[in-house]
Amino acid sequence: MGIPKFFRWMSERYPLCSQLIENDRIPEFDNLYLDMNGILHNCTHKNDDHSSPPLPEEEMYIAIFNYIEHLFEKIKPKKLLYMAVDGCAPRAKMNQQRSRRFRTAKDAHDARLKAERNGEDFPEEQFDSNCITPGTTFMERVSRQLYYFIHKKVTNDSQWQNIEVIFSGHDCPGEGEHKIMEYIRTQKAQPSYNPNTRHCLYGLDADLIMLGLLSHDPHFCLLREEVTFGPASRNRSKELAHQKFYLLHLSLLREYLEFEFQECRSTFTFKYDLEKILDDFILLAFFVGNDFLPHLPGLHINEGALALMFSIYKKVMPSAGGYINEKGVINMARLELILLELENFEKEIFKAEVSETKNNGNSDKPSFDFLKYITESTNDIKAMTGEQKNYFLQIKKFLSSREPFIDFSANISSVDQRFLRRLCNDLHLSFSKIIKVDGTHLLRITFRDLEFNDEDEDEIEQDEIERVLQKYDNIPLLNEEQALKEKNVEKDFIQWKDDYYRSKVGFSYYDEEALKAMAERYVEGLQWVLFYYYRGCQSWGWYYNYHFAPKISDVLKGLDVKIDFKMGTPFRPFEQLMAVLPARSQALVPPCFRDLMVNSESPIIDFYPENFALDQNGKTASWEAVVIIPFIDETRLIDALASKDKFLTEEERKRNSFNAPTVFSLAEDYTSFYPSSLPSLFPDLVTRCIQKPYSLPSMEGKEYLVGLCPGVFLGAFGMVGFPSFHTLKHKAELVYHGINVFGNESRNPSVIVNVEDVKSALTSEQIAMQYVGKRIFVDWPYLREAYVESAMDESYMYLASNSTIEKRDLAEIEKSQWGRKCSHKIREYSKRFGVLFGDISLLLQVRPIKGLEYTREGALVKIFNESVLEDYPAQLVVEKIAIDDPRFTEREAPPVEVEYPPGTKAFHLGEYNYGRPAQITGCKDNKLIIWLSTAPGLDAQWGRVLVNDSKSKEKYYPSYIVAKLLNIHPLLLSKITSSFLISNGTKRENIGLNLKFDARNQKVLGFSRKSTKGWEFSNKTVALVKEYINTFPQLFNILTTHATKDNLTVKDCFPKDDTQQLAAVKHWIKEKGINSLTRVSLDEDALDSDIIKLIEEKASTIDSTYQVPKKVFGVPRYALLKPSQTRGILHSQEFALGDRVVYVQDSGKVPIAAYGTVVGIMLHHLDVVFDLPFMSGTTLDGRCSPYHGMQVEVSMVLNVTNPQFVVNTRAGKNRKTNVSANNVSQGTDSRLVTKPTSTFPSPPSPPSSSVWNKREHHPKPFSLHQVPPPESLIHKSKSKFSKGNHHSTNGTQSIRGRGGKRGKPLRSKELNRKHDHIVQPMGKLQIN
């Protein structure tokens, strides 16, 4: 099914399922699974963009690495990272893969021809995305790079060192997501499986939702990029840091589906089981779309097809006797009930199409109203023919007899057969077709076995049968005219289907054998897909050998098929390549096979047509068209390839084989040399990562578990961070509500949750007294802890004051705000989230939790964000949760020797050598002994000086001054500096400069900014607009005349030769690089590329010579900063543009101890340009050199220009009057060490031939664990890379920041106890 369409439908029907990831407000996860093919496509090419030159391949690799790192940092898995690349797929999937690849190649070819016809530039070389197919040299190279990347991360990144990493590459058979599900399915069958394992699966396919649901693990989320529609999907930043991600919570989707089918609790005549309803839901979704079978005609997700399936399911299941999907096996008799109801729907589609044809002469798209059909159609029989009345009376007599069955001829009309099926369904009878020994075909009706057989159930069943018989007794007979009309309708209906089969598959509806074979193949396909999802691939060779599905009513003809799949084996990589690639992608297959794709004498040349038909088949989007190409004959393909096998090289033979997945882990006492996967770019590694083949646990004597695991936590008792509606008392219903998720109100129904006010009997004052000054949980249903600082009703404010609550009257302005706040909250929750909670009597003002903070003694205490005060209706807060979040658990200080064992990495917070790397070697008398990387004095102020000097030369003028300077109308200036759209027929053309964006609250760095008085523009803007005016004076004469006029047309602006003049304007704007200018939020303070270039030039001159470390004794714990402590200490730092910083985490994309300069400041993040390049570095949207930039959280770096955590040392005092040469120790022990001991070996220098020798940071003080590789494997010459990046800071720097303006924390312990924190806002700490 279409991904955007399904996501939109689901988001509007179940509006709280998806959660935007903001900061770290997500659950903790044990396992992260990456469906890698989506990442590969994202990082190698743009969708449908054939005009851009391809990226260099090394940039693709780095983009892939960055994407993996970015997702890892978002989720931070605790136990497992599983990366799965698509391997050779089952034949059933190859049909779709083959169609997509043929279409991709044809689209690229057509785009080139179109560009040539229009005289447009087109790149000579293009990236063929078809290379992302198992067996290509590109995929082999990607695997090699990923192996290197994993070794690098496990060796250097602390967050990768305590987990298991599994990589399943293109040489492991199976689709990526199904390899992942096989892993989960097998693990779940093991006795040691934790039923509360927390899963996160990244991927773009809609079927991942189904795979997640069928796991029946409630602690399961899907991670995906933001889905945008319309203009919002364009003009995005290229920086990965700016990409929004969503979590789709299957815990909430499960509960939404429980709401969806809640009426079934009272209507089912068998045991209600949500897990089995979820299994049925998965099967129903297959009818709307899947990757293995064409969709049934007329069922479209965006038109309400799933809602229709739900409606039919609720209607027929009460009499079904059980569920349709029985642990992955289809109950055909129960599926038949669904298909019978769908047959009535198909007739309505037919009538709508006939009506549309008569009215408009166009039957391509039936004007059928799904919603009206679902809500108004009862499908009750309005009248019966004489024959049908006779059949009814015979069955009525049969019910009162003691006969076990009754038979009818199988030759009765299809209309009468449908009547009998419907009657049997209503009477809970079984309807089937049989063949007697003599070959006679009969329709047999028998009593259906019931799940319950007690007397009460028998009595209920009998009462229902009596009601049905009474209803049919009262159905009138059709008169002759009506009967004739019905026959004609049926005749036209058959002809409609006959036209379909003749045009789509080349045989007639009346060819019963061919139609039955097609229907049986489709039903066989449904079972194959269900097996594939629940048990894994049950046949590698099976596939659906038609381009189209049968009509819905004809699927019934295939329900008697005998299912018998033969497992077979997967295609080898080259067989898959030759099966799915078009001739236009022949360069991707081994040379010896290419002739088979293009030579007219090739025995399989018919597999590779250059031209082929596309059939929209009722779909609207061009990419949804059916590609009409031949199916692959497996035997012919393999025979043809066998004749060429002898010409394969040894490397190609290796690439044509299968391998097992690989598992990676850290070995503490192991080091090995790992050669570069790309010597021109990456250095060799000294790795501590070991790899070995991975195999799944044995399933011998075990069965796959379908359903909930024993011991799983559900609902309000689920694992922390996994949302549930059950934390508050509520009800839910499916109604038309006009939910607005994507900017427009939905016309489809949504599940609306109505929260009950359990405190309605209390006054607002009583409720306030219960909550104010307490900790509660807000953001229902996701929940996060918060501190209630105050509360307000329409008359009073209630505030926490020491140990009491103060009540005061509202000021007049507060009274006026009360009504607006309440109405805004009610509307927001109602229209965006589908939550109703009645009127608001009390609003709580809360400060959300910010995290944990370290005290000076090393304890952890909660802090609440003092810069954020949020309003929440009292009805939507939760007082307690079942499981506390371990991420916010306070703790006492551990002993020094426990928290700082030998070998611990840290950063020094002493006055001298502030921010320099250090390493713990021991502990004595509750004080630490460290090796400290000292550095000579260096000015840490140069960044600020450079920025201030550059900004002093950058003049900005109010817009009215600029208008005067340019001698144009102020309104014209506003238009021309914005997006200025003029009409060109049905299109809109932009002749504006896009230098300001009011609606988006964005400015363009170096060109515009907005003050409290309005927009201001720089000299650059003045010069650019002046050039625009001088280049097109006639245009501006016209625009000046019409400065106040809206809705200008191209003809208005260019009266003569409008097409050529418009093209000239657009070309000029393009040549000026307007679209490449950097847009940022108005709130963001950032530097443009010109200033950043000066910063990079200055940084390149800094001496980064490695310094001999000094041994320092008597260092207190609060004079050191461990990487694991950064969030709890550095969260309130202040920064200014130009500040010098050092990266102080031992995980993430930036090398530890890397120095850089702040070039952008946001609320929670900084843009930093680092002195030396590193593998994951970016260009910060084109503002800095490649591999230098990165957006980091404020707590990831230590500000060394403005030191805010300085600890005074005795050595620091002594140094002011008696400065030693190079060996001054710091701390209370003044013993000096002139050189390191033998336990501090000099780390190895990477090979000099690597470009990364000049780019990658090499933090020497943190390389104690490394052992040099064999001398013969190391390149002899040294490189710049081996110098590292440990720039020293100014030893006499005296600036002391107060910290806290970014949100001074509100601490816990009743929030009034004072702690002696390591952060001393009024000055330095004194070491005694």
Curated annotation (Swiss-Prot):
EC number, UniProt record: 3.1.13.-
One cellular component (GO) term of this entry: perinuclear region of cytoplasm
Principal subcellular localization: cytoplasm
Cofactor requirement: Mg(2+)
Entries under InterPro entries matching the protein: 5_3_exoribonuclease, 5_3_exoribonuclease_1, Rib_uL2_dom2, SH3_12, XRN1_D1, XRN1_D1_sf, XRN1_D2_D3, Xrn1_helical
GO molecular function: 5'-3' RNA exonuclease activity; magnesium ion binding; RNA binding; RNA nuclease activity
Localization (cell): Cytoplasm; Cytoplasm, Perinuclear region; Cytoplasm, P-body
Regulation: Strand exchange activity is enhanced by fatty acid synthase (stimulatory factor P190/210).
The organism's place on the tree of life at top rank: Eukaryota
Region of interest called Disordered, as start-end residue ranges on this chain: 1211-1328
Pfam families given in the database record: SH3_12 (PF18129), XRN1_D1 (PF18332), XRN1_D2_D3 (PF18334), XRN_M (PF17846), XRN_N (PF03159)
Keyword Magnesium: yes
Keywords: Cytoplasm, Exonuclease, Hydrolase, Magnesium, Nonsense-mediated mRNA decay, Nuclease, RNA-binding, rRNA processing
Sequence ranges of Basic residues compositional bias: 1275-1286
Entry annotated with the keyword Transferase: no
Biased composition (Polar residues): 1217-1231
One GO process term, biological-process aspect: rRNA catabolic process
The protein's role, per its UniProt record: Multifunctional protein that exhibits several independent functions at different levels of the cellular processes. 5'-3' exonuclease component of the nonsense-mediated mRNA decay (NMD) which is a highly conserved mRNA degradation pathway, an RNA surveillance system whose role is to identify and rid cells of mRNA with premature termination codons and thus prevents accumulation of potentially harmful truncated proteins. Involved in the degradation of several hypomodified mature tRNA species and participates in the 5'-processing or the degradation of the snoRNA precursors and rRNA processing.
Assembly and oligomerization: Monomer.
Family classification: Belongs to the 5'-3' exonuclease family.
Entry protein name: 5'-3' exoribonuclease 1
